[in-house]
Amino acid sequence: MVIITTIVIVIMVATSAGKTRLKPHYGDGDDDRAYVPPDTGIDNDFLPDPKPLRIVTRNEWLASPPKEELTPLTLPVNKVIIAHTATEGCTTQSMCVFLTGHIQQFHMASDSKNFSDIAYNFLVGGEGNAYEGRGWESQGAHTKGFNRDSICIAFIGTFSSVEPSKAQLSAAQQLIALGVEENKLAKNYRLYGHRQLAPFESPGRALYKILQKWPHWANELSNNHWSDPEDQNSTRQ
């Protein structure tokens, strides 16, 4: 009888311990997701994909202030333009923060683009975060002739032959959905690849093919579009 009682007690203690054991909370202080080890790529995350959208604010990525007051947008806008930054990519928040700051410096430098601020409204990183550029309220400087009625989302990286990560694609889709929900984007907005409206390879051939399967895709070209020499199936105006 004593032996049986002892066994029952041991089983109860083990079961209770199993129920209360928690995974440790990891993080490097600038990422609010639980159980994400410092500086890991999104592919190694413990959370399911897609993860909830996180927008890293200008203050968080240490943005420089604009050189001058930015022109406000009239909301909701009717176009979403997807670009790529034509830089290296990033798979950790620390690297994405670094690249976002570097892109802003390049855009604002007097011996470079000499823009008032970073050109894009938002950027998305390979780790699945969105980064606030000019935001929802201000005109970008990304697509001449179309800045006043659009939001530009730039994928950090170069996607001529390599596709973005699932987390990066998800961040952009969630950001667009948020824009519609908050009346920043018209419910019947049109989605464009940067190359459709400007003579640039952006957003890269691989990403451009993916965009053509997204909702609200606009199968049209401006007079100043990019002509891809490798794409025999380009749409014609």
Task: Describe the residue ranges of each PLM region.
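Basic/polar, cationic surfaces and motifs that engage anionic cell-wall
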Residues: 1-87, 125-237
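A general structural signal for stabilizing positions within well-ordered secondary structure
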Residues: 71, 113-114
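Active-site acidic/histidine clusters and adjacent loop/turn architecture
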Residues: 74-111
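Alpha-helix termini
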Residues: 110-113, 182-183
